[in-house]
Amino acid sequence: MTPRIAVMGAGAVGGYVGGHLSRLGHDVTLIDAWPEHVETVRAQGLNLYGMTEAERCTVHPPILHLTEVQGFVKQRPVDIAVISVKSYDTEWATLMMRQYLAPGGFVVSLQNCINEERIAGIVGWGRVVGCIAAAISVDLYEAGHIRRTVPKGGANHTVFRVGEVHGRVTERARMLADMVAGIDSVKVTTNLWGERWSKLCLNGMRNGVSAATGLPGNDIDRHDAIRRFSIR
């Protein structure tokens, strides 16, 4: 049976990944807190854009507002719960999804920062998998519309890094990697913590500068003086 996937947080990253998983034929339900976004996707679909016309598509995955998630109790349990919310929302988002997990289901942290320990505190270490989206640069710029503002990584850059907290390569890590391989390049890592810290260091260099200047990350990278400041 096809694994049932629920994406908690259908914003830029969660919506992009969940939308493309839906495009690839996976059983995906999106969940989000923004009512206008939810209603727009229901009525018009989720519009995904990239750097080329070939990357543009409209998908129609099921989508729920947070207040509607209790409807899962009447449906098949969730095999993969993807948490793609801000770090400070991790605990309640995981707690909300825990009761709908299948007995062998697991939770994937598709987030910045290092939240696997927070998730494990709710569902246990054995039900946690990490997935890093590196240099994906996506933006939910209006309800129902998500764009990617950098080229696909392909052979030049591995975008998705899937890993277990204990570092071993498992069947479920391979399965998750196979799923996202249809979106962009992926690897199963044996060093999830190293990957997490590398991403955190990069975010630490750029996010504060972005907040102070009002510039998105891509514009910071293109500005010689600001880029040098970030590196220093």
Predicted features and spans:
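Rossmann-like NAD(P)-binding element
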Residues: 57-103
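Small-residue-rich helix-loop
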Residues: 222-232
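Conserved SAM-binding loop
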Residues: 30, 82, 109
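N-terminal glycine-rich dinucleotide-binding loop that anchors FAD/FMN and/or NAD(P) in oxidoreductases
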Residues: 46-66, 203
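A short helix->loop->beta-strand "cap" motif at the edges of active sites that frequently abuts
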Residues: 102-106, 126
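NAD(P)+-binding Rossmann beta1-loop-alpha1 motif at the extreme N-terminus of oxidoreductases
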Residues: 1-54
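Rossmann-fold dinucleotide-binding core
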Residues: 76, 110-199, 204-205, 210
